Amino acid sequence: MGLVLKEFNNKIRTALILAPFFTFAQIVIDLIIPSFLASAISVVFSIDKLKQDESGGKTISVDFIGGANINFANVREAQIVLATTVILLALCGLFFGLISIYCASYVSANTSFLLRKKIFAKLMRITTPSHDHYGSSTLLVRLTNDVYLMEVIAFDFLRLIIRAPLLFIGGLVFAVTTNQDMSISLLITFPLILLVIGILNRKSIPLFKENQKSVDKINERVEEDVSGYKVIQSFNLHSFTNNKFKIANEGWKKNSTSSLFINSLNIPFTFFLSSLTIIIALLLVFQLDSSVSVDPLPQDAAIRPNIFAFFQYNFYIVLGFILTSLTMVNFNRSRVALGRIKDILSQPEIKTITNKDQKELLPTLEFRNISFGLGNKNNNNFLQNLSFKFEAYKTYGIVGPTGSGKSLIANIIGGLYEPNEGEILIGGEKIQSIDSLYLSEMIGIVFQQNILFKGTISSNIKIGIETRSDWKNQSDLQKNEAMKNAAKIACADTFIEKFSDSYDHNVEQLGKNLSGGQKQRVAIARTLITKPRILVFDDSMSALDALTEKKVRENIENDLKLTTKIIISQNINSIKHADKILVIDNGRIVGFDSDQKLMKNCSLYQKMKESQKDLGGDFDAVN
């Protein structure tokens, strides 16, 4: 709750105060009621004597626990007053309890709402290495299950954490006041209850940690298998994947069984010790209280109500222990969850730079001695001492074998990774001094993995301009025209207009109802609509046929003459038209020149081009 306390509005703060207040009021009433019930029982057991007193003209005196007594004119008045008082107290307790529950529910629900909002906003801002470290399955668990546990403990804090000690302390005080002889039994069983709860609580914490790890593994397993179901189907890997899931599921079952068993022992042990308390109390009262006889004689009337009240307060003491143990279970689970949430919230964020005096920059890109490794260790850099410069308005290619580091360069250009060494310059300015918003609007990247969002084709293409400052005052008509123009450049209009609902065609989650080529063209249009001044294609035309790819390249060259274009690909045919081509091998630059010159002075480029010719990779004759 403390993580979002500052974000509480006045309504939530009011509920935060009222919840414990009405909980306290409810407990006070609950503790008073047994005293009135005991007095009512004393009236019932002494009814004959009271009638005799009444006939003799005497007032009726009813004793209450704690030594207080009230005089009544007759038996009927005593019955009516006591019955009415108990009913009114019960109704007040119910009313206060309902208000307390509502306020606690309101606060806990808003706590989870604000916490989930805060975590989600953080996930959208954490650095790519942090995201890669945790993985989407673990992040999903922390956003859902862990936040739910925090909601539970917030409710417990406002209700049970206050209710449990009040029931215990209040029950203990009233029990001692009711009958000191019977209260001796509490000295015997009370330490045993504390010992049991302490031992079980200590054993449960590591089990909950292991249980949360098991949940992460199951989510990771499910996410991987569901995402790769086509591979599983094609290779008939059902038994293999079922076995892997079974292992993860059995690990969770084992940890869950142990944690549930340990924490469930609280209740039976507590009830056992409660019954033991009652037995010891009865033995003590018959041994120590000489007013109690074997036969139900009138002199026993005073002790019988006290025995009833003592049992009631003993129940409150036991209930306080049970609520404490249940709260401790949730507390231990939430403490593990809180640590995991704090771990996420403490992760470094993408740096935001504000420069109100930001000037227009030429779309040039320069790497100066850039080194980078996913391990973030300078002595383990994969990209080694990269230095090159892309001039404005020209087209550049980046090519290299699989795993050579091409996509790493794209991610560094897009600001997803920060280099361990070296400098990046845009328009001759160090990237650290450029306004972040200006930079994001200046650079556009079409990533290797084309992620589309659930919605429509229109919403997916226009999502790129929804938050841009230069589009805020544009009309829907202007946005639609820009969308159609971007789709035309990306050759996406040819299939979009075949749909009956055209640009309003439904797109399922991750674009599952579109083909690979269709998704790539929508993704290209989504970036083109932003009119970036530096445009990066990270192997983002791989699903297009040769004719369509050539047409898209030609459209981009003709329509984006004032844009610096960077095309990353393994296919020589996709980049050989570029003004210059950067050849990467194992994280190092092995060539940077035009296609013709690289064919003379770069052996790797020569080998790649020859191998792709042999495989039918040169499509010039076809095109």
From Swiss-Prot:
Superkingdom, taxonomy of origin: Bacteria
Keyword Transmembrane: yes
InterPro entries named among the record's database cross-references: AAA+_ATPase, ABC1_TM_dom, ABC1_TM_sf, ABC_transporter-like_ATP-bd, ABC_transporter-like_CS, P-loop_NTPase, Type_1_exporter
Subcellular location: Cell membrane
Listed PROSITE patterns: ABC_TM1F, ABC_TRANSPORTER_1, ABC_TRANSPORTER_2
Bilayer disposition of the protein: Multi-pass membrane protein
Transmembrane regions listed in the UniProt entry: 27-47, 81-101, 157-177, 181-201, 266-286, 307-327
GO cellular component assignments: plasma membrane
Binding-site residues for ATP, renumbered to this chain: G400, P401, T402, G403, S404, G405, K406, S407
Keywords tagged on the record: ATP-binding, Cell membrane, Membrane, Nucleotide-binding, Transmembrane, Transmembrane helix, Transport
UniProt keyword annotation of Kinase present: no
Residue intervals of the ABC transporter domain: 365-611
Gene Ontology MF term list: ABC-type transporter activity; ATP binding; ATP hydrolysis activity
Residue ranges annotated for the ABC transmembrane type-1 domain, each copy included: 16-325
Chief location category: membrane
Protein family according to the UniProt entry: Belongs to the ABC transporter superfamily.
Name used for this protein in its record: Putative ABC transporter ATP-binding protein MG014
The species this protein was found in: Mycoplasma genitalium (strain ATCC 33530 / DSM 19775 / NCTC 10195 / G37)
